[in-house]
Every structure is written in C-alpha cells, then in structure tokens.
C-alpha cells in the first residue's frame, strides 16, 4: 500500500505580542508566523496496525504521551471512517524548543491523514480538530506564513506574501522544565484583556526592510519571562548579536530557540559555521524562513 510522507517545518514566531489574559485564563496573542526549511518528517503507512515509531537525532528526548499518539486516538474515536495506520516520526528538531516541533508534527500528521482519506476527509473540520490538539497546531496544519490572533485559532493571509529571510536557528539544548510555557505565561503577568479588544488586521510588507522594521517594533513579549525560566537564552542572543552582518535577533515562541537574520544565505551559512565552532553543544541550523 502507498505510504504518505509530509515535511513538518519548524514554526518561527517572527513577532509575538500578548494582548492580554482572558477571563478563562488563556492569553490572546498576535503573531507573525513563518516556517523554516529545517524540520521533522512524518510518514503514514495506511492500513497497518496503529503504532508510532520514532527515529532521528532527538528521538530519545521524546518521553511520555506524544501529541501524534493523541491525535491518532482522537481521530479513531471521533472520525471512525478515516484510515489510520502506522506512523513514523523522524525527529530532527529539538523538543520543547519554541519552534512548534510537536505542533508541526501534528500538523503534518493531519495533512497526511487528509491525503490518505480521499473524499472521506472532506467531511472533517481539520482546523477545528487541530485546535483541540493545541493552540499552534492550526497554523502548523497550514504550514505557511500567516498572521495568527486569538489563542491561535484565527489565521489570516499576509497581503502580498512574506519576503524570504535568511536566518540561523540556535537552541542551547539546555534543560527545560516540562511546564516551561506555562511558567513563562505565569511570569508574564499579562493584564486582563480589554472587553473591547479587537485584533488588528494582518500587516502588509512592501519589501524585506519593511518586514524587518515591523519585527523590530513588535518583538516578542515572552522574551524576558522566557529568559528568567531558561537563562541560557541570554547567551544565545548575545552570541547572535555579536556576529558580523547580523540584522536582527530574537526569541521564537517561549524559547529557548532563537533566530538571527542575515542579508544573504551565504552570510547565514557563515554565521552557522562560526556558532557551531564556538558553541559545539548547541543546535545550530542555517535556514531560509518564509
């Protein structure tokens, strides 16, 4: 039987602003999200016994319940007519890294299941199902540059598209608490969301300089709280900003992965080599983001 394969690219929050905390405890955000060329790979073998296997450089970092197993179980219980099967995950991205690794994997799994389902998949509300798995899963299901608001459920296209950025992704591979993201949001102490709040529309960028200017203004509201939880973030940002030709450096999501933007793919590759030599225990990957 034919197998189905999907790439699960790293999700990068080019900007992340927290609008406030809702009465239900969730935080409303606005974030410009794009995707890198680095990522995991999800393969589905339809018809085989339902199972999940994992390989890759970060396979041993996955422990406890896995979002892919949960997705398969939920689909089997709510959409009995859809095919499932054996799933293999090639885990190339660091875990709990702020680049949506688990969410990207879940989004890729839903895409392969949608492809394998044929016409039966047309009856499934994949966006709604993605949201039940996590706030970042809907944008990772789409796996393209989008403007994300609400808790992650509202997605809008970027008018005229997003200029490509030449970047380096860096993760210090520090010990990260299992409740990292919850700790970061607790430490943020965001104000209560105003009753009249309405998310702004998706931004428009005339060129790459306009995009970088927008990123510098918006930044990442989680960065100070995230660095308090994982202090190594400070060292990563310092290493990035010390590099020749660096144009911008920031934290993605709740971290600890950071990214630096460079004027060309060649400059990004040189930065990757320099960082890998200076910090051999870090995960470093040059990648276009778009």
Regions found by a protein language model. Give the residues of each.
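Phosphate-handling active-site elements
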Residues: 77-88, 111-133, 264-277
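Conserved, helical-rich catalytic subdomain that frames metal- and/or nucleotide-binding sites
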Residues: 142, 147-248, 263-266, 273-276, ...
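Glycine-rich beta-strand-to-loop/alpha-helix junction loops that act as flexible
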Residues: 101-102, 251-256
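DPxDG-like acidic metal-binding loop motif
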Residues: 97-123, 139-141
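Short, basic/glycine-rich phosphate-binding loops at helix/coil junctions
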Residues: 48-61, 109, 131, 210-219, ...
């Amino acid at each position: 039987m034919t197998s189905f394969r999907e790439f699960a690219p790293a999700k990068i929050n080019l900007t992340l602003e927290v609008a406030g905390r809702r009465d239900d405890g969730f935080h409303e955000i606005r974030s410009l999200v794009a995707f890198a060329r680095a990522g995991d790979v999800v393969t589905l073998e339809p018809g085989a016994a339902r199972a999940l296997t994992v390989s890759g450089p970060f396979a041993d970092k996955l422990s406890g319940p896995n979002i892919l197993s949960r997705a398969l179980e939920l689909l089997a219980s709510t959409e009995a007519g859809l095919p499932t099967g054996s799933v293999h995950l090639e885990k190339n991205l660091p875990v709990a890294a702020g680049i949506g690794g688990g969410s990207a994997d879940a989004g890729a799994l839903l895409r392969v299941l949608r492809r394998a389902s044929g016409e039966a998949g047309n009856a499934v509300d994949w966006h709604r199902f993605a949201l039940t798995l996590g706030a970042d899963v809907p944008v990772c299901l789409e796996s393209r540059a989008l403007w994300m608001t609400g808790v992650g459920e509202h997605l809008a296209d970027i008018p005229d598209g997003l200029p490509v950025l030449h970047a380096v992704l860096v993760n210090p591979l520090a010990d990260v608490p299992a409740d990292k993201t919850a700790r970061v949001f607790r430490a943020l102490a965001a104000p209560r969301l105003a009753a009249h709040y309405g998310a702004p529309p998706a931004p428009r960028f005339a060129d790459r300089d306009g995009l970088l200017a927008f990123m510098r203004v918006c930044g990442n509201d989680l960065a100070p709280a995230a660095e308090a939880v994982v202090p190594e973030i400070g060292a990563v940002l310092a290493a990035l900003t010390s590099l020749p030709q660096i144009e911008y450096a920031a934290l993605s999501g709740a971290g600890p992965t950071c990214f630096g933007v460079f004027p060309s793919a060649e400059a990004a590759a040189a930065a990757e080599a320099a960082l890998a030599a200076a910090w051999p225990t870090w995960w470093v990957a040059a990648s276009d983001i778009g």
